[in-house]
């Protein structure tokens, strides 16, 4: 069979496809060039692309024309001649059936590979889209370089002494993390004083204000000074000796001694009760020493 006959047999009338050089090229071209349609149109295009199917269609048309002419008692010799030629073509094309079968299996394999490639392409496109979004969320290289240059300039301007001073200020409000060493005692450099410093300060204040702490409530400053001066005079000069006789008699009155300081009059029972109350009110808890801290 010549190339012209093959091209004429492989070119269907219902499809706009160009003439193919052979049966295999015709079938491959038809499968790769048709646009997506429904299943019936796809199957029809596949059948029209096969030369044997086209020969069968022509054989059926020629046989129908010949039968019609014979029924009218006017036999058509051209239809009979065309029928004989088509029959010879069909006989010669029967040897190409295994080739068509091989082409069909190859097409099915290519369709499966194409479907697999489409799925992988869709997956790759999805990953590329995610990577694109991640890259858009990152800062630009120029921006990062500008920020690094700015930070470097700022570091160059900061002096080490200023940095150390700032670190010392921060250290007063920070401490070692508890996960580092829980048993270690941190530095006592807080902005508030420690407890021992507070105790020493309270004792110093008490020593400065000893007169106020030792004075009785309701007593004036002059009387307090006189009382303190009298106590000092008693401790400085010889005291008045009191002797108690064995028979339980009255105490003897001591000799008179002039010191230049007026002694206070003897206190009565009411005054002694007031003094006792004052002593009770003066009982201040000034023992702030804690030996456990040293």
Curated annotation (Swiss-Prot):
One of its GO terms (biological process) is RNA polymerase II preinitiation complex assembly. The keyword Chaperone does not apply. Keywords: Activator, Coiled coil, Nucleus, Transcription, Transcription regulation. GO terms for cellular component: core mediator complex; mediator complex. InterPro entries: Mediator_Med4. One of its GO terms (molecular function) is transcription coregulator activity. Residues 1-23, 214-294 are annotated as: Disordered. Residues 99-125 form a coiled coil. The keyword Ribosomal protein does not apply. Disulfide bonds: none annotated. It is found in: Nucleus. It comes from the Eukaryota. Pfam families: Med4. Its main location: nucleus. Component of the Mediator complex. Belongs to the Mediator complex subunit 4 family. Component of the Mediator complex, a coactivator involved in the regulated transcription of nearly all RNA polymerase II-dependent genes. Mediator functions as a bridge to convey information from gene-specific regulatory proteins to the basal RNA polymerase II transcription machinery. Mediator is recruited to promoters by direct interactions with regulatory proteins and serves as a scaffold for the assembly of a functional preinitiation complex with RNA polymerase II and the general transcription factors. This is Mediator of RNA polymerase II transcription subunit 4. It comes from Eremothecium gossypii (strain ATCC 10895 / CBS 109.51 / FGSC 9923 / NRRL Y-1056) (Yeast). The lineage of its organism: Eukaryota, Fungi, Dikarya, Ascomycota, Saccharomycotina.
């Amino acid at each position: 069979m010549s190339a012209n006959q093959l091209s004429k047999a492989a070119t269907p009338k219902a499809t706009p496809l160009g003439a193919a050089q052979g049966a295999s090229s015709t079938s491959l071209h038809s499968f790769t060039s048709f646009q997506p349609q429904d299943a019936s149109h796809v199957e029809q295009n596949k059948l029209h692309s096969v030369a044997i199917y086209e020969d069968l269609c022509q054989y059926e048309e020629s046989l129908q024309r010949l039968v019609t002419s014979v029924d009218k008692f006017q036999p058509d010799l051209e239809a009979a001649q065309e029928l004989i030629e088509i029959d010879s073509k069909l006989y010669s094309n029967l040897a190409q059936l295994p080739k068509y079968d091989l082409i069909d299996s190859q097409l099915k394999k290519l369709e499966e590979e194409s479907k697999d490639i489409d799925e992988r392409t869709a997956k790759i496109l999805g990953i590329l889209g995610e990577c694109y979004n991640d890259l858009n969320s990152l800062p630009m290289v120029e921006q990062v370089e500008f920020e690094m240059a700015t930070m470097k300039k700022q570091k160059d301007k900061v002096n080490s002494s200023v940095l150390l001073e700032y670190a010392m200020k921060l250290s007063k409000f920070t401490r070692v993390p508890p996960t580092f060493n829980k048993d270690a005692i941190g530095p006592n450099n807080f902005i508030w004083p420690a407890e021992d410093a507070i105790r020493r300060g309270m004792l110093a204040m008490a020593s400065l204000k000893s007169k106020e702490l030792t004075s009785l409530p309701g007593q004036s400053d002059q009387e307090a000074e006189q009382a303190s001066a009298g106590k000092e005079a008693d401790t400085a000069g010889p005291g008045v000796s009191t002797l108690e006789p064995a028979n339980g008699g009255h105490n003897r009155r001591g000799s008179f001694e002039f010191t230049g300081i007026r002694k206070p009059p003897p206190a009565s029972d009411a005054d002694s009760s007031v003094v006792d109350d004052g002593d009770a009110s003066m009982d201040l808890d000034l023992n702030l020493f804690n030996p456990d801290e040293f």
